Amino acid sequence: MALIEGVGDEVTILFSALACLLVLALAWVSTHTAEGADPLPQPSGTPTPTQPSEAMAVTDSIRGEAPGAETPGLRHRGQAAPPEPSVGLAATPPPPDSPQEPLVLRLKFLNDSEQVARAWPHDTIGSLKRTQFPGREQHVRLIYQGQLLGDDTQTLGSLHLPPNCVLHCHVSTRVGPPLPPCPPGSEPGPSGLEVGSLLLPLLLLLLLLLWYCQIQYRPFFPLTATLGLAGFTLLLSLLAFAMYRP
């Protein structure tokens, strides 16, 4: 007696084996994960303290020498010692036009909308455009106090911008020239392996296998199984014709 009425046992066993193989393949793919790389050890920034024994050895060697003798070690240390600054000279203050904090800029557009940008004084006009408008820096014009900032190599520190200053921004919407059409023989093909394109060949291969089993083992295929196989063949033929027709 057949396991499923109207379907032969060979067909049932074949579909069961295919289902088991599919489940095993999905389980293997889901568990196939790459191990993460181990983090690199961070170098220790703690300096090694100086051993006190070295200082004691230097002191003992100095005491053992004669008072009038001059050792090479003392001469070397005397030459390497930096000169002490005189009392009358004051330290040079840092220049007032080199702030350490970033500049806060307000980019104002034609529709009165604003955008806050942060930049450093050593940044250039071109780097500011690339940071705030990636891919559109060629269509952006910055205006400060009625002057067009057209030199992209000019630094922000040279402009002496005050905090929270307003830079008027004009973004051009002009579209570039259209690209020439590609020749018929150089059309880019699909990249990568498409799973959908493999479904129809697999179904055709399975259909051929079923028809081979139906011919070789005709007693195991009743009339209902043969009619179902013929209907499936007709449906798959229409699908293949619809997909591959010019």
UniProtKB/Swiss-Prot annotation:
Residues 103-176 form the Ubiquitin-like domain. The modification Phosphoserine is found at residues 98, 127. It is found in: Membrane; Postsynaptic cell membrane; Recycling endosome; Cytoplasm. Keywords: Cell membrane, Cytoplasm, Cytoskeleton, Endosome, Membrane, Nucleus, Phosphoprotein, Postsynaptic cell membrane, Synapse, Transmembrane, Transmembrane helix. Residues 35-102 are annotated as: Disordered. Residues 40-50 have a biased composition (Pro residues). It is a multi-pass membrane protein. The chain crosses the membrane at residues 11-31, 195-215, 221-241. Residues 2-30 are annotated as: Required to release iHOPS from membranes. One of its GO terms (cellular component) is nucleolus. Its main location: membrane. Gene3D superfamilies: Phosphatidylinositol 3-kinase Catalytic Subunit, Chain A, domain 1. The modification Phosphothreonine is found at residues 71, 92. It comes from the Eukaryota. InterPro entries: TMUB1/2, Ubiquitin-like_dom, Ubiquitin-like_domsf. One of its GO terms (biological process) is ERAD pathway. Interacts with EEF1A1, GRIA2, GRIP1, CAMLG, TUBG1. Interacts with NPM1 and CDKN2A; TMUB1 can enhance interaction between NPM1 and CDKN2A and is proposed to bridge the proteins; proposed to be mediated by iHOPS. Interacts with ERLIN2 and AMFR; TMUB1 promotes the interaction of ERLIN2 with AMFR. Involved in sterol-regulated ubiquitination and degradation of HMG-CoA reductase HMGCR. Involved in positive regulation of AMPA-selective glutamate receptor GRIA2 recycling to the cell surface. Acts as negative regulator of hepatocyte growth during regeneration. This is Transmembrane and ubiquitin-like domain-containing protein 1. It comes from Bos taurus (Bovine).
